[in-house]
Structures are given as C-alpha cells and as structure tokens.
From Swiss-Prot:
InterPro entries: ScpA, ScpA-like_C. This is Segregation and condensation protein A. Disulfide bonds: none annotated. It comes from Staphylococcus aureus (strain MRSA252). Component of a cohesin-like complex composed of ScpA, ScpB and the Smc homodimer, in which ScpA and ScpB bind to the head domain of Smc. The presence of the three proteins is required for the association of the complex with DNA. GO terms for biological process: cell division; chromosome segregation; DNA replication. It holds the Pfam family SMC_ScpA. It is found in: Cytoplasm. PANTHER family: SEGREGATION AND CONDENSATION PROTEIN A (PTHR33969:SF2). Belongs to the ScpA family. Keywords: Cell cycle, Cell division, Chromosome partition, Cytoplasm. The gene is scpA.
Length: 243
C-alpha cells in the first residue's frame, strides 16, 4: 500500500472542483445525484488500485451521500424553505477554495516573472505599528486583503528603480512564513502594513502575500479589520505555533 495524489488532486475539494469543471456543472445549482456518483467512482477507483485514501476523501463522500439523501426525501409544500438548501455549506466551501486557487495561481505567476529582476536593497525604515485598541473579532474577506496588497505593491513600485534583468537570491514562502510567525511570538497581533519597508523587491511583497494566504487557510493566522478602510491586523490563529 502506498499513498499518491490521484491526478495530483490536493484533497477532496480539489477533486470535487475538478468534476464540476469537467462536466460544466453550475456551482450554484449542483445536481447532487450526478456529482456524488462521479465522486464515488473516483473513490472506488482509488480502492481498486490499492491507493491509500486519505480519511478526508471518505468524510466528504459521506457528506455528499447525506446531502443527496436529503434532497431525495419527499417534502410537503409547507416544509420547503428556499433558504434551507442542504448544498449551501458545500457550495460556500467550494467557492472559497476556488478563489484561493485562482489568486494563488495569479500571484505565483507574478512571482515567477519578478524573479528575473534585480532591485536595490531595502532601506531600513520605521515600521507602521499602532497601539490603537481593536476588537479581534472583525475578520475581512479575500477581496479586502487583495486591495491592501495592491496598495503595498503600488507604493513599492513608486520607490523601485526600473528593472535590470539580473537574477537575485530568492525570498521563499517558508522565509516569509517564519517572519510572520516570529512577529507573533511576543505579540498576538500586528499591523499588516508593518511587514513592508516599501523599498523591498516586489517579489518579496508577492511572497509575503502568498505566505499570508496559506497561513490564513491553514488557521495559523487570522486577518482582521475593525471597519472598512481601516488598518488590517494579522492575528494568531487557532493553529498558531512558534518553534
């Protein structure tokens, strides 16, 4: 027995999204019977090939069967609630996962392009930390984080000389993750913009942003904001661990 990723799927949601795209299914109106059958065929194929199936694939299989059975149950008119669709939670998770994949692909392309450019070394500047009180329960969505990233990118580009095509050392996502983790060691939150000097290479900004996306997805950090247009805070998540 050995473990592989069938067609390089990164988990059950990745497989489910692949099936939705392959069969051109409307993600907002999923035909649960057809999709469940296709998903179960993949799971059975993995079993027949003696592939060690991760438990998360089986958990999602059970969830799909439960949703399918709920939708097949007869309902009287009085029982029907248009706001109580058993697919709602699954659709929300699929859309969120799809957004992460799309944004990560775009940022990876940008990082690969910028790896070919050399810019001047960062100048030491004071960080933008603030001591304002804040409520740790105001999370933000991915769109607001993209807007914040664009603000940093624009400011960095204003302070960056035009490119010369010379390879430079690569700043890795692992290094960016370690920087963020270290910043949270002694303080449970910090200002998102304080990560940047605004004179660093743009690829370093992109790498930091990719790291923040991955850490947020893994529950290592939360990304929070009091009100629209105010400062964004990076906060320890439930899975945060230093060292």
């Amino acid at each position: 027995m050995y473990e592989v990723k069938l067609d390089a799927f990164n988990g059950p949601l990745d497989l489910l999204l692949h099936l939705i795209q392959k069969f051109e299914i409307d993600i907002y109106d999923i035909p649960m019977q057809a999709l469940t059958e296709q998903y179960m065929q993949y799971v059975h194929a993995m079993k027949q090939l003696e592939i060690n199936i991760a438990s998360e694939y089986l958990v999602l299989a059970s969830e799909l069967l439960m949703i399918k059975s709920k939708m097949l149950l007869p309902q009287s008119t009085s029982d029907i609630d248009v706001d109580d669709d058993p697919r709602e939670d699954l659709v929300g998770r699929l859309i969120e996962y799809q957004n992460y994949k799309e944004y990560t692909a775009i940022l990876n392309d940008m990082k690969e392009e910028r790896d070919f450019y050399f810019t001047k070394r960062p100048t030491e500047l004071s960080h933008l930390e603030t001591d304002e009180s804040w409520d740790p329960n105001h999370t933000i969505d991915l769109t607001e984080l993209i807007v914040a990233y664009q603000r940093v990118k624009n400011r960095v580009e204003l302070n960056t000389p035009k490119s010369v095509e010379i390879r430079k050392e690569t700043f890795t996502i692992q290094q960016a993750t370690e920087q963020v983790t270290s910043r949270l060691k002694d303080k449970d939150h910090f200002n998102f913009f304080s990560l940047f000097t605004f004179s660093e290479p743009i690829e370093q900004v992109v790498t930091h942003f990719l790291a923040i996306l991955e850490m947020s997805k893994a529950g290592i950090i939360n990304i929070e904001q009091q009100r629209n247009f105010e400062d964004i805070n990076i906060v320890r998540g439930v899975n945060y661990h230093f060292g």
